[in-house]
Amino acid sequence: MKKYVLALDQGTTSCRAILFDRESQIVGVAQKEFTQIYPQPGWVEHDPEEVWSTQYGVIAELLARYQVTSEEIAGIGITNQRETTVVWDKHTGKSVTNAIVWQCRRTAPLCDELKMKGLEPLFKEKTGLVLDAYFSGTKIRWILDRVPGAQEKAEKGELLFGTMDTWLVWNLTKGRIHVTDYSNASRTLLYNIKTLAWDPDLLQVLNIPLAMLPEVKPSSTIYGETAAEGLFGHPIPIAGIAGDQQAALFGQACFAPGMAKNTYGTGCFMLLNTGEELYESRHGLISTIAWGLDEKVIYALEGSVFMAGAVMQWLRDELKLIETAGDSEYFAGKVADNGGVYLVPAFTGLGAPYWDMDARGAIVGLTRGSNKNHIIRAALESMAYQTRDILEAMEADSQLPLQLLKVDGGAVVNNLLMQFQADILGVEVERPHCIETTALGAAYLAGLAIGFWSSKEELRDKAKMERSFKPQMAEERKEKYYQGWHKAVRQIME
């Protein structure tokens, strides 16, 4: 009897395996961290073999710990850290060098060079992305330049590229399948999100052979089966793939245009479903593919805030104002409001929609009456203001008024922050019962492809909300606070 869908969540710091039942409830979780490699400042790498062995290990641990047999698993869904780049030898299955992680800045000079040649508009128009070291394309170029003989081998079709989803599928199928999905392909700087094909012009600019790129398929389809001689002992369909942020959008059941989710982690990642319409941002956001499903491609606008939970870490580790991030709610709640104090966390510059990399952080509006609680409250509120900045840019780009914001990530347990977020946006904020929205999204995509669940409507009905926060603040007061934030931002940009 097929009772479960297995989600593999290959993240930036850990690999996880999570089992979901037909009610989309979590049956079991196994997780293990792997090594972060920092060869020099600004560089970040992972060892692909270690990532695979860690992922393999957590699957084995999950099955053993919860006494689940592979016969009970209907299918597998995969979600992954996006953009991280692996290049491996087709014949040996071994990577030619460490994976270059999405956070790695080593290809920034190459991006600058391409911008100087006036190529950024070409990339933006075809891929929806900005020319940045974040995305995979320049990482592939770096590997082909630095590994002896790599370019020649790639041209002969002897080397393969993949993001982490592709690498896991290759290993799960013992090298039989080289595939990715629309959402991951759309993060490479090489995939044309309008024609839905690897773009010959962009491949030519970066001199990347088409032969090394995976086949691109919808996010919910049977890609193939696990090797019978592998971990599971018999074939299991691999039926869902999506990049982590897109998977979270799907896991939050943001199926309709105008629905958005915000993940509050170290930074914030916001995605707005724009339906089958592709909007090109005029406000520094990126356009991306959310997923491919039911013969349709769904697009999204994405914006990120660099500093969210990281501000709480700063209050804890550097300023020593709190002992744990959770303390922030207690101290912030001891004052009625921010007392005119604003904290602009531009520690590494300001992201969307300002894009000022030279700006630096500041605490403004201090008076003799300001105390530690005001500063802690201002730090919390900065997450909500930055979220509104991005959502206003999304509304301006798409003309889609936000109906509801779904939230996930570590900071959403903070009720004061969630209520303030609802107040400052003027829309309802929903916190889900299942906070594992990324893994749930991968499970949903796989489950739909194999008939484990019948439709998106069924999934929407299963989505359980833990708590809803409705706006309570008067309009005039809300706008006064937000104007104060803008004034503080202007001060650090001058």
Curated annotation (Swiss-Prot):
Keywords, in A-Z order: ATP-binding, Glycerol metabolism, Kinase, Nucleotide-binding, Transferase
Gene3D superfamilies tied to this protein: 3.30.420.40
GO cellular component annotations of the record: cytosol
GO biological process: glycerol catabolic process; glycerol metabolic process; glycerol-3-phosphate metabolic process
This protein's record includes keyword Cell inner membrane: no
Residues that, per the record, bind glycerol: R82, E83, Y134, D244, Q245
Protein residues bound to ADP: T12, R16, T266, G309, G410, N414
UniProt enzyme class: transferase
InterPro entries reported in the protein's UniProt record: ATPase_NBD, Carb_kinase_FGGY, Carb_kinase_FGGY_CS, FGGY_C, FGGY_N, Glycerol_kin
Keyword Kinase among UniProt keywords: yes
GO molecular function: ATP binding; glycerol kinase activity
Record comment: activity regulation: Activated by phosphorylation and inhibited by fructose 1,6-bisphosphate (FBP).
EC annotation from Swiss-Prot or TrEMBL: 2.7.1.30
Sequence positions that bind ATP: T12, T13, S14, T266, G309, Q313, G410
Domain of life, source organism: Bacteria
Catalytic activity: glycerol + ATP = sn-glycerol 3-phosphate + ADP + H(+)
Role, per record: Key enzyme in the regulation of glycerol uptake and metabolism. Catalyzes the phosphorylation of glycerol to yield sn-glycerol 3-phosphate.
Assembly mode: Homotetramer and homodimer (in equilibrium).
Family designation: Belongs to the FGGY kinase family.
Protein name: Glycerol kinase
Lineage: Bacteria, Bacillati, Bacillota, Clostridia, Eubacteriales
